């Protein structure tokens, strides 16, 4: 990063916290208040990304008898009180935390919602490589109303494909998406088997696309038939729990691996809808002089990533 900045003498200031930005009164431009004083600018590009503030759903119980924390504040099993753990959310954070806790000897329940679970590696190539050669980084933005689901992939122990059946056979109890709480009881949707089936479908679809690409291009990448072999469905999938008494199960902690949201409270301009989502077209805001970068699916799948954001930066 430092070398790239030096290559064109970018006037970068590091270690600066922005407190607020708002329009100047009586003349064009904006005033930005920072930890190193005020700055005036004619344009603002907000490239702070979508992961600014941890989200815990409103269904979280109000009980003080059990510790609750967001995955953003989880560091290791030793920080948690004794007892079992209910991990809610089975994206990359949730599955890796559940795996680590189970390996540390904890009793773990993992609440699994809708997800994609791509292969970490397939035919000696990383998942990110496959997204590139298959053109998936440049896939157009999701159509309005199309569901966005979390991605379950692990970087632990060198990285590996997430396999929910393997987690269950390892000792993690899988449950469906959490729908609420009733006193000491956690309540789950009866959707566990369907969520796993859909995750399998997304996984197999990528393997099929990769195999077809290898055949078309005559690449010498070894076949990997074992990637299509699944363990049998464990009992927690074939006969899933629909409720769980936390006290009776000895659960002392709930970890909410439920993602993040944006936080634009510092940007005091008329560029947001009623839900405080940026209003823009390909990053060009409805507020003149304000632009956004790094948002999910801003124009394509890669818009949130370093290797994909350049398309949107060039457009702006």
Regions found by a protein language model. Name each.
Residues 2-316:
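Flavin (primarily FAD) cofactor-binding/catalytic cores of flavoenzymes
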């Amino acid at each position: 990063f430092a070398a790239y900045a030096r290559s064109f003498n970018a006037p970068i200031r590091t270690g600066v916290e922005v407190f607020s930005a708002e329009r100047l009164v009586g003349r064009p431009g904006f005033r930005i208040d920072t930890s190193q004083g005020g700055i005036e600018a004619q344009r603002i590009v907000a490239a702070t990304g979508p992961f600014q503030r941890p989200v815990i759903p409103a269904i979280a119980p109000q009980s003080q008898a059990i510790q609750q924390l967001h995955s953003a504040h989880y560091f290791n099993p030793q920080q948690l009180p004794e007892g079992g753990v209910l991990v809610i959310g089975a994206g990359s954070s949730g599955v890796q935390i559940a795996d680590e806790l189970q390996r540390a000897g904890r009793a773990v329940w993992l609440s699994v919602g809708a997800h994609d679970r791509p292969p970490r590696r397939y035919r000696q190539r990383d998942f990110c490589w496959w997204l590139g050669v298959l053109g998936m980084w440049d896939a157009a933005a999701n159509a309005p109303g199309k569901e966005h689901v979390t991605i379950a992939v692990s970087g632990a122990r060198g990285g590996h494909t997430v396999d929910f059946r393997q987690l269950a056979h390892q000792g993690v109890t899988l449950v469906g998406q959490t729908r609420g709480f009733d006193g000491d009881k956690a309540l789950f949707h009866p959707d566990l088997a369907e969520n796993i089936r859909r995750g399998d479908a997304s996984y197999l679809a990528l393997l099929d696309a990769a195999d077809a690409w290898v055949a078309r291009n005559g690449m010498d990448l070894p076949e990997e038939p074992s990637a299509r072999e699944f363990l049998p469905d464990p009992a927690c999938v074939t006969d899933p729990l629909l409720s769980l008494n936390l006290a009776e199960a000895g659960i002392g902690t709930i970890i909410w691996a439920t993602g993040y949201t944006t936080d634009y409270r510092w940007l005091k301009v008329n560029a947001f809808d009623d839900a405080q989502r940026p209003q823009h077209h390909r990053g060009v805001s409805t507020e003149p002089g304000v632009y956004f970068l790094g948002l999910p699916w801003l124009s394509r799948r890669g818009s949130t990533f370093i290797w994909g954001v350049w398309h949107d930066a060039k457009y702006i």
